[in-house]
A protein has these predicted regions:
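Activation segment signature within eukaryotic-like protein kinase domains
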Residues: 20-21
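Activation-loop N-terminal segment of eukaryotic-like protein kinases
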Residues: 48-52
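Regulatory activation segment
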Residues: 54, 66-76
Length: 169
């Protein structure tokens, strides 16, 4: 996806990003149901096959999620894509961690901008919604992206099924 975005002038329409990322979200819903977290979702880990089919790569950072979908993990940081809980080794991670990262991928794909780092956002949140940037996207999509990028994990979607539904309301 990173290379594709580079070729497309750094961003694509919401509709095209939805076509690319919906299958990835469905895959991640299944991954989470199996008790795994990816923990490294970013454009450079989404490969577009010649037929346009997206594939999620690099499960090297993935971990089993114990204790009702939550556990502690070593640091895995990708600036702009890592949620606050990945910066603190004592914080719990779960599906909400991957949801934040998917929100960041959507944001990057449609705005052409990598979201500010979560640590920077926790001091003064400079994140501007896609609609506020003047992009022509559905309000549901704008709300869903911003909800996924919420700094508080409890205010994000609980799972990818919920996130998909949020985009479709």
């Amino acid at each position: 996806l990173k290379n594709y975005l580079d070729v497309q002038g750094d961003r694509i329409s919401f509709e095209e990003s939805w076509e690319i990322l919906l299958p990835i979200m469905k895959t991640l819903a299944e991954v989470h149901e199996a008790g795994l977290l990816h923990r490294d979702i970013a454009p450079d880990n989404i490969f577009l096959c010649k037929n346009g089919e997206p594939k999620l790569l690099d499960f090297g950072s993935s971990r089993f999620a114990f204790s009702r979908g939550m556990t502690e993990f070593p640091l895995t940081i990708k600036p702009g894509y890592a949620p606050p809980e990945q910066y603190r080794d004592f914080d719990r991670q779960g599906p909400w961690t991957d949801i934040y990262q998917m929100g960041a991928v959507f944001y990057r794909a449609i705005t052409g901008r990598i979201p500010p780092e979560a640590i920077e956002r926790s001091v003064s949140d400079p994140l501007t919604s896609p609609l506020q940037l003047g992009l022509n996207i559905p309000e549901e999509a704008d709300r869903s992206i911003m909800k996924a990028l919420n700094l508080d994990p409890q205010d994000r979607f609980r799972n990818f099924f919920e996130m998909i539904k949020g985009f479709q309301c």
